[in-house]
Amino acid sequence: DLSLLVLDVTRGLEVQDFRIITEIRKAGKGLIILLNKWDILPNKTEKSFDHIVKDILEREPLLEYVPILSISAKEGQRLHRVIQEIRTVYENCHRVIGRERLAEVFSNLMQQNPHPSRQSRAVVLKRACQVMVEPPVISIETRTPELVDESYKRFLMKRFFEEFQLMGAPLRLNFDQKLILRKDEDLEQFTLSSNSV
């Protein structure tokens, strides 16, 4: 259900690491990034971790919602935190948000920050419904899915991650002309492995 990506912090994040991250996200798996060999990082200061995380997020902003931990597998450093994060991310990947809560958050977002018009056409996002868990998928109804702006999609993702505490989960947004409404209690049967969406 989830992947632990172990990186050699002494080498930094490489192009192949980003390819692996992309594949993990495509597969709909939760993700935790482990910066290994922290014990032998040269020139380490109190701010080293923050600088490394900042560099990672500048290269891939969506990793803001992925736990990143510094560890030493050799020394057993912070491995208890890894276990805690595994539990949290697993729960987040299987979270049922709740129709009423999602409707409330979505309505507030649309009132405060509606989608801007594009190509002289209004882009109206009508309603949202969670249609799947493992990974969590939120479907949003609109007559013009092709006009939904990429930056607005990122805005919605950011707000949903924050509002619904989905750290590490591979949240997906679908924009559809017709919404399939599902009951919260039925969501467990709709997973990527069941090919139900």
Predicted regions and their residues:
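C-terminal-of-GTPase-core extension/linker across diverse P-loop GTPases
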Residues: L5, R11-V197
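Conserved acidic residues
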Residues: D1
